[in-house]
From Swiss-Prot:
A GO molecular-function annotation: electron transfer activity
Name recorded for this polypeptide: Probable Ni/Fe-hydrogenase B-type cytochrome subunit
Topology of this chain in the membrane: Multi-pass membrane protein
Family, similarity comment: Belongs to the HupC/HyaC/HydC family.
Organism lineage: Bacteria, Pseudomonadati, Pseudomonadota, Gammaproteobacteria, Pseudomonadales
Tree of life domain: Bacteria
Keyword Cell inner membrane: no
Length: 240
């Protein structure tokens, strides 16, 4: 919610409202963000080449193992993404209340929808003055849940289902994700949806990076530096 609705009420409310810096993101959350960002880049690049392999190279296989290294990097980054996501879910329970914003979208609150519409208008250059937010703004929160949370879960489930084919029947991946391929119909269908999911996340990353840079420049609070140092820096002391 907007800054004035995010702060506690009381005698010291006005003083708190005028703070120009608030500690928002704890170290584990920031570490997760950048590790996840790196893993998504690795997954995107290696996944593209897995979907469109390089031309066959003549000679001994041991001397031409590039695709093998690419697949290994893809699998390793997939583990990092999945394990990191589980750690992020854990931190939502033990971290501060900002750590829960990624998973708990307050769609039941009328004020949230009002501010969501304000953010849509702001991003479309129809609002002259943006609001101040300590955590995610409503549009950012909704986008993170719809694109990242749902996208990461989908890619992890379909990815490990395909990984299970290589590990074989009876493997841990087959026992946990063997139901996915029959659900989609066949292995190729899962490959196709997994490939489309990659582009889904690529589009999200492009929009996310653009809007983060845009907000850092034209909004009333820091964004990129907040995910580095944890502190949200405000450019003015007005509460709204």
């Amino acid at each position: 919610m907007a800054l004035e609705k995010s702060l506690e009420t009381g005698d010291g409310q006005e003083k708190v409202r005028k703070q120009t810096a608030v500690y928002v993101y704890e170290a584990p959350l920031r570490l997760w963000h950048w590790v996840t960002a790196l893993s998504i880049v690795v997954l995107g690049v290696t996944g593209y080449f897995i979907g469109a392999p390089l031309p066959t190279m003549p000679g001994e296989a041991m001397d031409n193992y590039l695709m093998g290294y690419i697949r290994f990097a893809h699998f390793a980054a997939g583990y990092v993404l999945a394990i990191g996501f589980l750690g992020r879910v854990y931190w939502a329970f033990v971290g501060n209340h900002h750590a829960r914003e990624l998973f708990l979208v307050p769609v039941h609150r009328k004020a949230w929808w009002k501010e969501l519409w304000h953010e849509v208008r702001w991003y479309l250059f129809l609002e002259k003055v943006p609001k101040k937010y300590i955590g995610h703004n409503p549009l950012g929160q909704l986008a993170m849940f719809c694109f990242f949370v749902i996208g990461a879960v989908f890619m992890s489930v379909t990815g490990f289902a395909l990984y299970a084919e290589g590990l074989g029947q009876g493997s841990w991946a087959d026992r946990l994700f063997g139901w996915v391929i029959p659900l989609f119909g066949q292995s190729q269908d899962v490959h196709t949806w997994h490939h489309l999911g990659m582009w889904y996340l690529v589009v999200f990353v492009m929009i996310h990076v653009y809007l983060a840079a845009r907000e850092d420049i034209v909004s009333r609070q820091s964004l990129i530096s907040t995910m580095v140092g944890g502190w949200r820096m405000f450019k003015d002391d007005r509460p709204d």
